[in-house]
Amino acid sequence: MLILAGLGNPEPTHRLNRHNIGFIAVDEIIRRYAFSGGKMKFKGWLYDGMIGTEKAMVIKPQTYMNKSGECLAAACQFYKVSPENLLVFYDELDLPQGKIKVKQGGGNAGHNGLRSIDAHLGENYWRIRIGIGHPGRKDLVHSYVLSNFTTNEQDSLASLIKDIAEHITVLMSGDANGFMNKLSQTKKLLSKPLSTD
């Protein structure tokens, strides 16, 4: 079994924040593969279902970003899932908006969510870095990551998020390069922006 975790902040007002791209990504996976309705467990929303022939769980920690590791460590321990079978989706300032990089292990690059996960589980989990771009100045970072995507950004984002969900089985098989290739080959055509309901 795999655990797919999205990182974000829990309040509804943060729903379309750049910092919440991890939540946005796993929400589409939940929708596309008709995962069960969520239940609160391990200080997070937990959903279960099948992706292809693989049993999977999606977790959205509700602890705020800097305590994400508490939730994920509890879930991994309970379900006996090793860090190698944990996929974490999160925002990456140092990647241009819409770019994706996937890696197993590595540093946290100052990301508070990853720092918390590293402290609780070590570094050997999969990281799906979703680029949100950089505001250009360090003093603008805090307000930038907590601001909403613009309408135009939501358009391209919606297409990217659908592509991630469509091709997630490739990554779940352990083929990170194949997953990134699939995303780069897919044309980013959009029918509508993300819902703000």
Residue ranges and their predicted role:
Residues K101-G107, V145-F149:
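Short glycine-enriched, charge-decorated loop/helix-capping segments at active-site entrances
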Residues A109-G113:
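Hydrophobic alpha-helical segments within soluble ligand-binding/sensing domains
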Residues L2-G105, R115-I128, P135-L140, D155-D197:
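Nucleotide and nucleotide-moiety/phosphate-recognizing core
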Residues I130-G133, F149:
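Short, loop-centered acidic/histidine patches that primarily coordinate divalent metals
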